[in-house]
Regions:
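12-transmembrane solute porter fold
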Residues: 1-149, 173-191
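Peri-membrane helix termini and adjoining interfacial loops of integral membrane proteins
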Residues: 151-162
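Intrinsic disorder in cytosolic terminal tails and internal cytosolic loops
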Residues: 161-164, 194-200
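Membrane-interface segments at the starts/ends of alpha-helical transmembrane spans
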Residues: 163-174
Length: 200
């Protein structure tokens, strides 16, 4: 369940940030794309290191560390506005990439090690299901929250980005990332409960 929540919160970013960079901040598509590459680059660098550390020190510390970083990222995104320096976005996105790298490898290890050898295929398919379910939930939930927040701020129903009204978008974006923060907190709590159950 924690993985579903984290993948959902990740897709909040994938849905909202392109609007922020290209429409609100008026950055070119190529520049916005380069900025968004920070996340996968940190994943590429961090995931192998996370897997190595999982084998050395166990999954617990890394999982909690990754979730804490993801909570911090959602909070940082909440404070983005029209005047935020680009380096602030880059740092927040780098933390998100590192947090995901720290969380996913040990979380996968815990899932795969919790089943018998003959059930590894089922466990692997459940991991894939959690990822895809999180993506679907993230896309549906983030767009709903974004446009609801924008509609409330604008006083009329909004179903797309409003040209020349980035202030309205910022309101919806902040509400969206607040919910993303709550999802990360819920994932953190569920992980604590899972660890308590397995250590008894």
């Amino acid at each position: 369940m924690s993985a579903v929540l984290i993948f959902a919160s990740n897709f909040f970013v994938n849905v909202v940030i392109p609007f922020y960079l290209q429409d609100a901040r008026k950055l070119s598509a190529s520049y916005a794309g380069l900025l968004m590459m920070v996340f996968p680059l940190l994943m590429v660098v961090g995931a192998p290191l996370s897997g190595y550390l999982t084998d050395k020190i166990g999954p617990g510390i890394l999982t909690f560390g990754g979730l804490l970083l993801l909570c911090c990222t959602s909070l940082m995104y909440m404070f983005l506005d029209m005047n935020s320096p680009i380096w602030y976005y880059v740092i927040a996105t780098a933390i998100m990439g590192l947090g995901n790298a720290l969380f996913q490898s040990p979380n996968n290890t815990m899932v795969m090690s919790s089943v018998e050898k003959q059930d590894l295929g089922v466990a692997g398919s459940m991991n894939s299901f959690a990822r895809n379910l999180g993506m679907v939930i993230g896309i549906a939930l983030s767009t709903t929250i974004l446009y609801r927040g924008m509609s409330e701020a604008y006083g009329e129903r909004v179903t797309t980005y409003l040209a020349n009204r980035p202030d309205i978008f910022i309101v919806g974006m902040r509400e969206t990332f607040f919910v993303a923060f709550l999802l990360c907190v819920a994932a953190f709590i569920l992980t604590i409960l899972r660890f308590r159950k397995t250590t008894k």
